């Protein structure tokens, strides 16, 4: 078949805040391909309810306070240079978002209406109602569509990045100077894999929470960029730090899970087990108001000990009208499932929410592979360390997009397209039975990760996950070599790679720190604190 070869100065894989803001910042100097595996509205950015953290109210707040809050949340293993960079550059990037048409809520006096979230010492979260992410995403989409130099490829799915490996050179983890020449991208309309050649490639593919059964993320979050870079022998770091939201609505069959906000516990919600007993007093003096990771661990422990798959959140003691006024969306959603939250307990369970680790990058957003940058949730800048401070993620994406854009523009002229890249080998077919097996394997990955590499870990559980994933890996690689590339098989392959990375890096961290908690090493180790 006649396969397409497309050439762009910049190839951006992923279309959330990270990918789109990078594209907008470089498009005046060259052509940009924006690869988007679903529609532009399916990005994780769109679903970010909370807001975006930035010091704006200098009367009470300052950079030092925001830096300190971030370091404390990260359990002291954040990279101080990354923390300082994001926080000190945040205000100028907020201005850029406003220039692109983002509306942040203001008070009557014209100042920003700021929220305060767990772990922040001051009010510093800019927001747009309770759907900040959607406001940012839709504003960026408008800007991107208007820009003549940006071409959006919707329903195109990146399969592999192209390196010297594809020129027949042996590449290992120790090869110096691995270079990225573009990517092989599946056109879902034609079913063919096209070759995209670029001078600069950017990974902005988001997180990998869909490897867990319970997740608050859209199901496109399969860790594609992280897996592609890992297979190309790039460096991936801190994958053991997965943030779980303690209270997602438990309704089997609902994927992704509906988020029951923190604010509900602040409002006076009480956690109970299925025998209606309160249990937080066993775990923390702050009860239901303890920090996210403590509450998530307590719920997890309660469920595992009792062999149950959820707990209850109870606001029935509060004034019904007050409850409806404060939480109209939650009230409506629960009512549609036959739960009246003013009279009934809300079934909740923790769900995978955010990945702190990812593709290791420097202060310019460069990965360990030359000509390849990584931005947003798929990258690991060192900002989050062992745990992310609320609302620090959207701001990290745009600050690093800005640095990466400046760096990429300064080196663009050094590079050319590599014309020697072979076409993708497009042989193979797939039967319906094999499709069913792929779906089944995905469910198995979800169950392995949920049961053995969840909130509370142990050596025994991690070894078990490792062995199970190994079997799935062998089966899937054999299938992948035989069949034609499809989004399903590629996503499965990526999920297995990412599950393996989370498991292996969890095994290597022989301590409990940040979001990584293991019963075999329940305390932080002294050595790491000094690093």
Spans of features found by a protein language model:
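Short beta-strand to alpha-helix junction loop
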Residues: 78-91, 124-142, 153, 215-223, ...
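N-terminal Rossmann-like FAD-binding beta1-loop-alpha1 element of flavoenzymes
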Residues: 10-34
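An anion/pyrophosphate-binding glycine-rich loop and adjacent beta-alpha core
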Residues: 228, 234-341, 346, 398, ...
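Rossmann-like flavin
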Residues: 73-113
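Conserved N-terminal glycine-rich FAD pyrophosphate-binding loop of Rossmann-like flavoproteins
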Residues: 38-71, 75, 243, 254-258
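Glycine- and aromatic-enriched mobile tails/lids
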Residues: 3-9, 25, 39-41, 47-48, ...
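Conserved redox-cofactor binding core of oxidoreductases
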Residues: 98-192, 197, 204, 248-251
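FAD-site-proximal beta/loop scaffold in flavoenzymes
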Residues: 160-172, 177, 181-190, 339-383
């Amino acid at each position: 078949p006649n396969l397409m070869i497309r050439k762009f100065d910049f190839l951006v894989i992923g279309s959330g805040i990270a990918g789109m803001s990078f594209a907008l910042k470089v498009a005046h100097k060259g052509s940009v391909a924006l690869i988007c595996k679903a529609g532009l509205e399916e990005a994780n950015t769109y679903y970010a309810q909370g807001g975006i953290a930035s010091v704006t109210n200098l009367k009470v707040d300052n950079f030092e306070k925001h830096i300190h809050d971030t370091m404390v949340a990260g359990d002291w293993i954040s990279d101080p240079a990354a923390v300082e960079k994001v926080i000190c550059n945040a205000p100028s990037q907020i201005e850029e978002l406003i220039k692109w048409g983002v509306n942040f809520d203001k008070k009557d006096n014209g100042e920003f209406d700021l929220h305060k979230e767990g772990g922040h010492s001051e009010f510093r979260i800019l927001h747009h109602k309770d759907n900040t992410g959607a406001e940012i995403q839709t504003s960026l989409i408008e800007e991107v569509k208007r820009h003549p130099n940006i071409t959006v490829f919707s329903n195109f799915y990146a399969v592999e990045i192209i390196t010297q490996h594809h020129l027949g050179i042996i590449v290992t983890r120790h090869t110096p100077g691995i270079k990225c020449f573009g990517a092989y991208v599946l056109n879902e309309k034609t079913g063919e894999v096209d070759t995209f050649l670029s001078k600069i490639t950017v990974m902005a593919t988001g997180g990998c929470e869909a490897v867990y059964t319970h997740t608050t993320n859209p199901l496109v979050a399969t860790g594609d960029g992280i897996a592609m870079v890992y297979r190309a022998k790039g460096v991936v770091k801190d994958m053991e730090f997965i943030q779980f939201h303690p209270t997602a609505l438990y309704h089997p069959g609902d994927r992704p899970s509906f988020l029951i906000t923190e604010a509900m516990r602040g409002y006076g919600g009480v956690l109970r087990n299925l025998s209606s007993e309160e249990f937080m007093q066993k775990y923390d003096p702050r009860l239901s108001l303890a920090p996210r990771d403590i509450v998530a661990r307590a719920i997890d422990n309660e469920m595992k000990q009792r062999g149950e798959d959820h707990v209850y959140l109870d606001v029935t003691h509060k004034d019904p009208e007050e409850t409806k006024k404060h939480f109209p969306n939650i009230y409506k959603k629960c009512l549609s499932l036959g739960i009246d939250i003013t009279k009934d307990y809300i079934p909740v369970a923790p769900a995978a929410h955010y990945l702190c680790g990812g593709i290791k990058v420097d202060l310019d957003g460069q990965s360990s592979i030359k000509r390849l940058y990584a931005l947003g949730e798929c990258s690991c800048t060192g900002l989050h360390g062992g745990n992310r401070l609320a609302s620090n993620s959207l701001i990290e994406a745009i600050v690093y997009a800005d640095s990466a854009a400046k760096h990429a523009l300064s080196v663009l002229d050094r590079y050319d397209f590599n014309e020697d890249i072979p076409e993708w080998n497009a042989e193979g077919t797939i039967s319906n039975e094999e499709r069913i097996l792929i779906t089944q394997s995905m469910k198995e990955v979800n169950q392995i990760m949920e049961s053995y590499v969840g909130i509370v870990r142990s050596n025994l559980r991690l070894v078990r996950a490792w062995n199970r994933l190994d079997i799935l890996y062998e089966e899937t690689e054999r299938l992948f070599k035989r069949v034609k590339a499809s989004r399903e098989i590629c996503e499965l392959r990526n999920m297995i790679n990412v599950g393996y990375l989370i498991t292996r890096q969890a095994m290597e961290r022989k301590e409990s720190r940040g979001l990584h908690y293991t019963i075999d090493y329940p305390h932080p180790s002294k050595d790491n604190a000094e690093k």
